[in-house]
Amino acid sequence: FFKSKGNVDSDVVLSVCGESGRTVEWLVDCYGVQLQLVKGFLYPGHTVLRMHAPPSRTGAELIASLVTACERAGIDILTNAQVTKLFSTAGGMIRGVEISRPNNSRELIGCEALILACNGYGGSPKMVEEFIPEIANAIFAGHDGNQGDAVLWGRKLGAEIRDMGAYQ
């Protein structure tokens, strides 16, 4: 609430806060992800210690352990592939994707469920202009692949999008 000066959906904030501790415990207990409370550093905007990280405090270790947890749970993760098309039922259920690989090969992959995820849209000047016009001319230091694809897909499927103006 403090960092956003109260400009948030309080129900969403309370839900995230209420479930985050149980989520950390679930990752540790059910999937063996090694996480510990980060002590000695109060993250910006935080009033108490609450950040958890792997022992090395590196993103590489965290991602590796999360990938291992997904593999144990039978969840497929595709990398080095860009989704070029979604296939859905008349009711809007996604049942497959078309992907392209760096060598320009294409694959069709069926699915029972699909998580639309992207690491932001900072690499898309058009989306930055639309959602955060005050930083439209800012230098973007992230990955060029951050084009907001999941946001675009969600819109096409009729999903509601909100709170798109936040940035660090």
Where are these regions (language model features)?
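Glycine-rich loop(s) and the adjacent beta-strand/alpha-helix scaffold that form part
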Residues: 102-105, 109-168
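A short, terminal or domain-edge coil/loop segment
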Residues: 20-27, 92, 133-138
